[in-house]
Amino acid sequence: MAQKINITNIPARRPFGRRRKVDPFTGQHAQEIDYKDVKMLQRYISEKGKIVPSRITAVNLKNQRKLAQAIKRARMLALIPFEVK
């Protein structure tokens, strides 16, 4: 006959999906957002020169605003181009 299934013996399943990325600008060893650090800013600019959205880079809202401001400031000082051809 059928055996009774004990719910306590069934292992818990992990939820399906990807893990949330960690914001690189938070934590103890986080780097500062600086408009003069062109190499760091280039990682958050697409191939066409647009600012990459936070849903892709996993930067939180507060740091995304700082990052966008730093990129715009670097563009005004001609450290990085406005658009890439």
From Swiss-Prot:
GO cellular component labels: cytosolic small ribosomal subunit
Listed GO MF terms: small ribosomal subunit rRNA binding; structural constituent of ribosome
Signal peptide annotation: none
Protein keywords: Ribonucleoprotein, Ribosomal protein, RNA-binding, rRNA-binding
Keyword Repeat: no
UniProt xrefs under InterPro entries: Ribosomal_bS18, Ribosomal_bS18_CS, Ribosomal_bS18_sf
Pfam families noted in UniProt: Ribosomal_S18
Any GO BP: translation
Source species, domain of life: Bacteria
Quaternary assembly: Part of the 30S ribosomal subunit. Forms a tight heterodimer with protein bS6.
Similarity section: Belongs to the bacterial ribosomal protein bS18 family.
Physiological role: Binds as a heterodimer with protein bS6 to the central domain of the 16S rRNA, where it helps stabilize the platform of the 30S subunit.
Official protein name in the record: Small ribosomal subunit protein bS18
Species annotation: Hyphomonas neptunium (strain ATCC 15444)
Organism ancestry: Bacteria, Pseudomonadati, Pseudomonadota, Alphaproteobacteria, Hyphomonadales
Gene: rpsR
